[in-house]
Amino acid sequence: VDVDDEASDDQREDENVDFTFSAKKYLADPSGRRLACRQFMAELCQKAIEQPETRMKDAAKLIKTLCDDPHSKEVAQDACASMTLLLLDILPDYRLREINADKNELEGLSDKVKKQRKEEDLLCKTYKSFLRLLTKNAKKGANSIVSGPSPSVSGKCLIQFLSKKPNSNYRGEILRAIISSSFTSSDVTIAEEASKAFSEICRGDENGDHTLEILQLMAELVKK
């Protein structure tokens, strides 16, 4: 599901978002471009934290674009880190609910509840879209040529989501990508950080569901 697939009120133009970081004036000065991107991402993230219902889409759209930046690996890494921190700040500690367009889920709800559900749906789609980029790159081999954040950076961002938001959406997909990255990455810190995250989750797992899921996925990958 694309992050831009939203209903009525959310389908406004991003007139306040500047997508000109690929302009010649920036490409001619890589360090200046990186600084400009950093400053702009920081401003967008701050606005999104203060007003997630109106600014989240702007921030997500630009940062996601920069995460796939073909001009600078450093800018892509900065964008990846910014988006990770933004989502960690905004995501709740429970599973978000997406709106099923086929099921008129908003019918009969009050305006306040409808607004809340739409905001939750947007956040869920934004999170899913970003995780898709991270999992795609994290699963690449050490010598793979990828646009955007490196497999190592992608893996570390996924570990942060798993550690700090273990009860949020898409835990299974995150676990698969982390375990795969631990086996394929030339960066040994990926395996070390993943092991630490798994240990912390298992220690706090009162009913054993998270622990069982981790063990099953590890066994599945080893068999392959």
Regions found by a protein language model. Name each.
Residues 1-224:
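Charge-rich, low-complexity intrinsically disordered regions
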